[in-house]
Amino acid sequence: MLRVVGSSVKLPVVNLTSSRGISAGIVKLNKKVAGPPPVITVKKDEPLVTPPSIEPIPITEEIVIEEKPKKKFSLFGFLFKSTLLLAAVYGGTLYVATKNDKVMDFVVDNQLPYHEELLDVIENTTKEDLEDAWYNLKGKASNVKLPTKDDIEQMTTKLEHKGEDLLKETKKKFTEATEKGRKGTELTPGEQLQRPVEVESITRNVTRLPLIELSSDVANSVDSSVRQTIASLNNFIQSIDATPLASSNTALVKSIDASLNQLAKKLNSLTTSFDEEVKNKLKKSQTELFSAYTKKELDLTENLLHQYNAEKAQLEKKLNQRLEQEVKATRDAVSQAATNAVSMVRIEQTKSFEKLVAEKINEERNGRLANLQKLNDKITELEKFAVSFENLIVKTHERNLIQRSVAALKNALLATPDVDATPKSITPYLETLAQISTNDEVLNLALRDLAPLVSQESTHSILTNAQLLSRFEQLAPELRSSSLLPPNAGLLGHLSSLVFSKLLLPVKGVKADGKDIESVIARIESSLVRGNLDVAVEEAANLKGWTRRLANDWVVDARKRLEVEFLLNLIESESRLL
């Protein structure tokens, strides 16, 4: 607000909040937009009052800022904030308990409320569960429809109609209650004239016929049907009293009363006799039932005694068996304990006897048998020498057997066989050698590689050097002719190679650098003559094309002989090292 100081003119204070509230109310009720409040313009340069001629008094402005009123204390807000803070602290404590063992021990020891369920929720809840819950809540919130402006207007109109109806009903009930509460004196003169005329009743004494009444000794034992009959007769008498001739029927009423009393006495006597008969029959039936009950009780008692005796006998039997088992087990335990005690005594006696004997022997050893220790040491050394000498003899014998077996196997495989001799299998030689060399790994490995090479061979199947040389000499012409074949030779090529191979001049001597077929054949023959089978096999294996294919069988046989020779030489060398 603005206030002018130093002048007699005061500006009106305009409350914007109140004007806004009034304008909003006008808009809601009349649906018309109210104009803004008038604005008062104040000129700051010109004073509102004409100043005196001596000194002009300046106008100072002071802006007063109104302080906002302090909020009142809200109990609901305090409780809500406290609950929210406590829930956050409690949830944080339980979450820290899942990560820290000390906090978990504190929670478990103090038995915080619902800590097990909340810990289970915290440990088992994942990020996916929270996302699913958020999506579900979001979907439910999206399904909620907020009321539109038309719905709000309809609701307000309904509330207005209901309020009017409620006021009408309240006024109606209030007027009815006031009309009922009025007394006759409070009525108006017109209402008093409209009231009906009241007539006063006049009573007089009239003689009536006597009613039927039962005597006191019969009244308590009369049946209800008789009482109903008497009541109906009394009603009939009262109806007669209403007629003008009631006095002439008094004798009739008395006679009816006498007959009803007699009837009541007879009924009472019949009832008494019936009750006595019923009592007698009840006593008789009670006696019969008591006798039957007694008989049944005796039967049940006898049956229970029989069952009791049977159960008792069975329990006694089981108890006796159990006692026998326990006695037997105790007897066995006692006998075993006694046996163990006797055994311990014997062991102790044996130990003491051995100790005594050892002491006596030590005394004798220190006395008469002083040199017995030296003799024992010499005997021990002699035993060691005998054992080592025996091992040496065994190894020497094994070595001799292995060398003999290897020599026999080598002679059978590599020696030149006689023409008239029959071929023999190599398997017995291998079995003998395998039985002898069971403790040497090198011999076992060599025999393991040698067995598949010669298991299917005989003494005549391994070719000698001379046989290999003769076979190669027979193979040489084919090698010469195949060396002259073109890459894709036909019949004419084979015939021409066969003819031209006859024209080739054989090479004498060894040419180390020669790569032609004649030089290779010459080197192979020279190596075979000198006994260098490995060099000859290497030269033949280096051949290419048709010449290599023709020489393949010869190379296989030569390699087999080389492998057998190598393995036999290895076995022989290893046997010498044993």
Curated annotation (Swiss-Prot):
Q: Which domain of life is it from?
A: Eukaryota
Spans through the membrane: 75-97
Q: Where in the cell is it found?
A: Mitochondrion inner membrane
User: Has UniProt tagged this entry with the keyword Acyltransferase?
Assistant: no
Q: What does it do?
A: Component of the MICOS complex, a large protein complex of the mitochondrial inner membrane that plays crucial roles in the maintenance of crista junctions, inner membrane architecture, and formation of contact sites to the outer membrane. Plays a role in keeping cristae membranes connected to the inner boundary membrane. Also promotes protein import via the mitochondrial intermembrane space assembly (MIA) pathway.
Basic and acidic residues bias locations: 174-185
What is this protein identified as?
Answer: MICOS complex subunit MIC60
Mitochondrial intermembrane-side segments: 98-578
Q: Which residues form a coiled coil?
A: 294-392
Pfam families attached here? Mitofilin
Record's keyword terms, sorted: Coiled coil, Membrane, Mitochondrion, Mitochondrion inner membrane, Transit peptide, Transmembrane, Transmembrane helix
The primary site where this protein sits is mitochondrion
Task: Topology check: give the Mitochondrial matrix ranges.
Answer: 30-74
